[in-house]
Amino acid sequence: LGVYDVRYNSSVDLQEHVDVGLSRSVDGGKTWEKMRLPLAFGETGGLPAAQNGVGDPSILVDTKTNTTWVVAAWTHGMGNQRAWWSSYPGMDMNHTAQLVLSKSTDDGKTWSEPINITDQVKDPSWYFLLQGPGRGITMQDGTLVFPIQFIDSTRVPNAGIMYSKDRGETWKIHNYART
């Protein structure tokens, strides 16, 4: 399985018409099935697809349950500026990027509706929270872990991890890396 941005209009990053694409191979990468969209918002909340971009995905396979998770940043109604500069403190989807998940229990063939976990993991003082870089892992005790990054209240970039100890039902941010 491989996840990536599907950028329809140009190479421009969020905010733009961007969906999360997934390619699936069952023969070690010799051939690939038709692209799937585990996260795509299209026209949502009265706004066009270009105002509902979702991208920069990270993937995690829960090796204990064989559930695949994809996490990405969704930018709803933030104009045409880049998400790094048009996402603001708070939690409202019209003003701050949302962190969303989708899960598959059939090896990436089908995907759940988006699961918005912003309220679980974002500090309201932060400007922007998103996943990555990199992919997630399953710890030996079953804890699911994704890398994250965020812009704090002073506009300083930070990195860390978010984790779930209950198979993805709830998520928390761990102490983040500081220099």
Over which residues does each language-model region extend?
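Asp-box/BNR beta-propeller blade signature and adjacent active/binding-site loops
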Residues: 1-179
